[in-house]
Amino acid sequence: MIIHPKVRGFICTTTHPLGCERNVLEQIAATRARGVRTDGPRKVLVIGASSGYGLASRITAAFGFGADTLGVFFEKPGTASKAGTAGWYNLAAFDKHAKAAGLYSKSINGDAFSDAARAQVIELIKTEMGGQVDLVVYSLASPVRKLPGSGEVKRSALKPIGQTYTATAIDTNKDTIIQASIEPASAQEIEDTVTVMGGQDWELWIDALEGAGVLADGARSVAFSYIGTEITWPIYWHGALGKAKVDLDHTAQRLNARLAKRGGGANVAVLKSVVTQASAAIPVMPLYISMVYKIMKEKGLHEGTIEQLDRLFRERLYREDGQPAQVDDANRLRLDDWELRDDVQGACKALWPQVTTENLFELTDYAGYKHEFLKLFGFERTDVDYDADVETDVKFDCIELA
């Protein structure tokens, strides 16, 4: 079928399979250009592997270090009459090119919060991956979590705490500057956000993997976080989501103490703001990203997801000199260091009050933001003919959980 973008709110409701494949190939090429190392992870599990930082982790492990990878995610496959989600096509492309490179690649499509997903992963590690993994990447960004056992559904809330938050934002449907107000989260919403987005599920995964004996000696685990700056703190770090990320920090400290006994470790990696399906949903982030992209591009500091993950693997987790990674006082790996530079943030703060609907495209990189957003779904690539027919029913080596 012929597919063009249709945007509703902060979601693009259509996806382009070939565009998604080209995006993945671009990330693979960027990774290969930095060389393949053999002194890093060999068997890698990525939980939340289909887009954003999770996908970039899997690409970096496979094509930067020659690792065998197993990915867990929740995506919708395409049919002959309807396109699937972008994540489905991303991983179909990854699987195709990983196998072509002689690498083991297997995927599980289902609820990554479920015990069934953990059981399936453990079985595959035992039967197909040599019995153990040496890196577990936790990269789930879901608004909803169904609790294993009870089946109770919890929802996260992107809300401030204590008082209504009002700030300048972009109405991305109309490309206009607006004042957005968000009511504060209730105590229940805060608690539920911690349950969905905190460290509880990460710990359940490590419990299950360790209990089954499928974590290698020296195994590492990393989960992703964002701290940001005072511009975004009210809605993020000081909001309900921030409470969840603090819980993630506490979880990392517990897991690190456990894994360190066998020569491994666990860390939270704090990453920079990038255009992903997750960040597009957070009020204020599109405007902040549009500003920080412009400033960082001008300073030659810009990184996308693949550059961030490449730096995480090569310069933090698996340093060539064999030294332990540099961490902050909370044992976090900081990849937001360039974004948080005083000159970058000073420029952001100076720019923030100046932006209006009229000068939005001129003063910020909002055009770049929109381009990156549509690219997430396979659109706006110059090497794809969007008026040509494209196959939407794409199959790959993926186990579907019931």
Curated annotation (Swiss-Prot):
Segments crossing the lipid bilayer: none
Residue numbers binding substrate: Y226
Known pathway: Lipid metabolism; fatty acid biosynthesis
Gene3D superfamilies named among the record's database cross-references: NAD(P)-binding Rossmann-like Domain
Residue positions of the active site: Y236 (proton donor)
Catalytic EC class: oxidoreductase
Pfam families with a match to the protein in the record: Eno-Rase_FAD_bd, Eno-Rase_NADH_b, Enoyl_reductase
Domain of life, per lineage: Bacteria
UniProt-annotated site: Plays an important role in discriminating NADH against NADPH, residues: E75
Binding site for NAD(+): 48-53, 74-75, 111-112, 140-141, 245, 274-276
GO biological process: fatty acid biosynthetic process
Molecular function in Gene Ontology: enoyl-[acyl-carrier-protein] reductase (NADH) activity; NAD binding; trans-2-enoyl-CoA reductase (NADH) activity
Key words of the record: Fatty acid biosynthesis, Fatty acid metabolism, Lipid biosynthesis, Lipid metabolism, NAD, Oxidoreductase
Enzyme Commission number(s) from the entry: 1.3.1.9
Keyword DNA-binding in annotation: no
InterPro entries linked: Eno_Rdtase_FAD-bd_dom (IPR024906), Enoyl-CoA_Rdtase_cat_dom (IPR024910), FabV-like_NADH_b (IPR050048), Trans-2-enoyl-CoA_reductase (IPR010758)
Annotated catalysed reactions: a 2,3-saturated acyl-[ACP] + NAD(+) = a (2E)-enoyl-[ACP] + NADH + H(+)
Subunit structure: Monomer.
Family: Belongs to the TER reductase family.
Purpose of the protein: Involved in the final reduction of the elongation cycle of fatty acid synthesis (FAS II). Catalyzes the reduction of a carbon-carbon double bond in an enoyl moiety that is covalently linked to an acyl carrier protein (ACP).
Name the UniProt record assigns to this protein: Enoyl-[acyl-carrier-protein] reductase [NADH]
Primary gene name: fabV
